[in-house]
Structure formats: C-alpha cells, structure tokens
Amino acid sequence: MSTLKKPDLSDPKLRSKLAKGMGHNYYGEPAWPNDLLYIFPVVILGTIACVVGLAVLDPAMLGDKANPFATPLEILPEWYLYPVFQILRVVPNKLLGIALQTLIPLGLILIPFIENVNKFANPFRRPVAMGFFLFGTLLTIYLGIGACFPIDKSLTLGLF
C-alpha cells in the first residue's frame, strides 16, 4: 500500500511557494506510515544485527588483568580528554591552564556577536566563523596528538 501525493502544478499558491523554494510538503511520499512503520524498523534491526553479528564473530578481549602493585609510567585520560590534558600539562601555571579552557566556551558564545549575519547563510560565506572553526579544529587535533607523546616532545610532536 503506497500513498503518493502528486503536485497540482496548476495551483497558483503551490507555484508561488515552489518559486520561493517552499511548498515541497504538498507532494511526495508521506512519512506516516511509510517511513515510521517500514523503513525505521528495518534500519534499527539491521544495525542491531550488525552489532550482534560482529560481537559474536570477533569478541573483543579485555586485555591484561589489572595489577595494583604496578602502575604505568604515565597515566593518560580517555582519548576525548587528550587536548584538555595537554593544555594542563604544557602550561606552567595550572590556574592559567584552567583559565585557557574557560576561553573556549566564551569564544564560542561570542562568535554570533562578532559576525552578525544571517544564521541560515552559507557557512563558506562566513569567514570569521569558518576561521574560528578551522583554527579550533586544527588546534584540538594538534593538542590531542601532542598528548600522546612525552612532555619533552609533545609541543613539536617529536618532529624536531
């Protein structure tokens, strides 16, 4: 059973909306029941089947058993905390390291006020926001990679 709405292109209201880039919900395939009853369960059950199949075919080993009397040389946090760990490790004053980390959300809050343009505009036409984003992304990757190295090689990533 399929219900498909076809557009009535003789309707002047629909034509004016289509000219403005709107009105696309007047025609096409409805989400209920087609997507919600048929496609979503197939995707969900397929994902569960893939995860269970991979878990059965290749079970992950848990690794070595913990020895409370032998600690590693350097304890690293989880991978998503590497950039923060690197900032705290490299900055000589810990209070300054925490202050640097508070600048990140403050900078994100200030971006809309610095570049006051249409929020629906093409992101490539927003050079200040794109510059902040690219700089922040590259800095985060650099700090995350640097956290994996010993502290004497962490700033140069072992290249120099």
UniProtKB/Swiss-Prot annotation:
Name the record gives this protein: Cytochrome b6-f complex subunit 4
GO cellular component, one term: plasma membrane-derived thylakoid membrane
PANTHER family the UniProt entry points to: CYTOCHROME B, CYTOCHROME B_B6 C-TERMINAL REGION PROFILE DOMAIN-CONTAINING PROTEIN
Keyword annotations of the record: Electron transport, Membrane, Photosynthesis, Thylakoid, Transmembrane, Transmembrane helix, Transport
Annotated Pfam families: Cytochrom_B_C
Family: Belongs to the cytochrome b family. PetD subfamily.
Coiled-coil ranges from the UniProt annotation: none
Alphabetized HAMAP family for the sequence: Cytb6_f_subIV
Subunit structure and binding partners: The 4 large subunits of the cytochrome b6-f complex are cytochrome b6, subunit IV (17 kDa polypeptide, PetD), cytochrome f and the Rieske protein, while the 4 small subunits are PetG, PetL, PetM and PetN. The complex functions as a dimer.
Principal location listed in the UniProt entry: membrane
InterPro entries registered for this protein in UniProt: Cyt_b/b6_C, Cyt_b/b6_C_sf, Cyt_b6/f_cplx_suIV, Cytochrome_b_C_euk/bac
The organism's place on the tree of life at top rank: Bacteria
Organism for this UniProt entry: Prochlorococcus marinus (strain MIT 9211)
Membrane topology value: Multi-pass membrane protein
The protein's role, per its UniProt record: Component of the cytochrome b6-f complex, which mediates electron transfer between photosystem II (PSII) and photosystem I (PSI), cyclic electron flow around PSI, and state transitions.
UniProt key word Electron transport: yes
Single Gene Ontology MF annotation: electron transporter, transferring electrons within the cyclic electron transport pathway of photosynthesis activity
A Gene Ontology biological process term: photosynthetic electron transport chain
Encoding gene, per UniProt annotation: petD
S-S pairs: none
Entries under NCBIfam families matching the protein: cytb6_f_IV
Annotated localization: Cellular thylakoid membrane
Transmembrane segments: 36-56, 95-115, 131-151
